[in-house]
């Protein structure tokens, strides 16, 4: 573009790629101002079960974007999911317009915790759940540290709360099934400091930008 004379700075053509630009003020391409990088934004979405975490599905199933069309505030930028939730998993799904923030939150090395509540059937002890703190290998796949606790039990039915810092495919379900439990409902209740709270199914709410900036400041790869 520079060689073609399409880039200008304060009305003068830029002749070399080595031109120092402290910011994008006064820069145009084909006569159009180049905007500053859009500020990172983060949204909490209460994903209902039965939606695919994808933009489109080759099988024609409903995706999260089907639900988001009417749920997102007007003039919202295009957003991407942070991680994913399986078809039948519900609860907190974070959405952002910032690719660097998305990647940083997904990386296991960032140590961002994800918390789930699982309704299960079967026999399990608190001691068995506490063993997951050391991680577990299932069919050759290593799953890292998981903090797990029995929350409530009625007969052989119980709710289990689990917190982990990685997001391998179907990790929570596979670990619980490995313990002999059948999972009938799985809800993500938190991702980092951002909680589902009282957000109704299908609703979206933006994270306060000051709160997001504080969180970003502690991330190793996505500082504002």
List the model feature ranges, each with a label.
Residues 1-224:
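Basic, flexible Lys/Arg- and Gly-enriched helix-loop patches that mediate nucleic-acid binding at interfaces
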């Amino acid at each position: 573009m520079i060689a073609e004379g399409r880039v200008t700075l304060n009305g003068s053509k830029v002749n070399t790629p080595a031109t120092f630009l402290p910011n994008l003020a006064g820069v145009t391409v084909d006569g159009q101002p180049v905007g500053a990088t859009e500020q990172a934004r983060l949204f909490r979405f209460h994903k209902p079960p039965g939606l695919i975490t994808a933009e489109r599905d080759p099988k024609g199933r409903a995706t999260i974007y089907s639900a988001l069309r009417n749920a997102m505030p007007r003039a919202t930028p295009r957003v991407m999911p942070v991680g994913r939730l399986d078809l039948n998993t519900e609860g907190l799904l974070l959405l952002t317009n910032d690719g660097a923030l998305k990647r940083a939150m997904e990386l296991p090395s960032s140590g961002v915790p994800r918390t789930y509540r699982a309704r299960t059937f079967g026999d399990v002890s608190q001691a068995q759940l506490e063993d997951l703190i050391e991680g577990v290998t299932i069919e050759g796949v290593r799953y890292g540290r998981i903090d797990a606790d029995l929350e409530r039990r009625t007969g052989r039915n119980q709710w289990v709360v689990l917190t982990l810092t990685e997001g391998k495919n179907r990790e929570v379900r596979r670990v619980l099934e490995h313990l002999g439990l059948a999972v009938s409902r799985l809800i993500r209740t938190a991702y980092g400091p951002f909680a589902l709270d009282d957000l109704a199914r299908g609703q979206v709410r933006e994270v306060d930008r000051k709160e997001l900036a504080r969180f970003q400041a502690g991330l190793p790869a996505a500082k504002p």
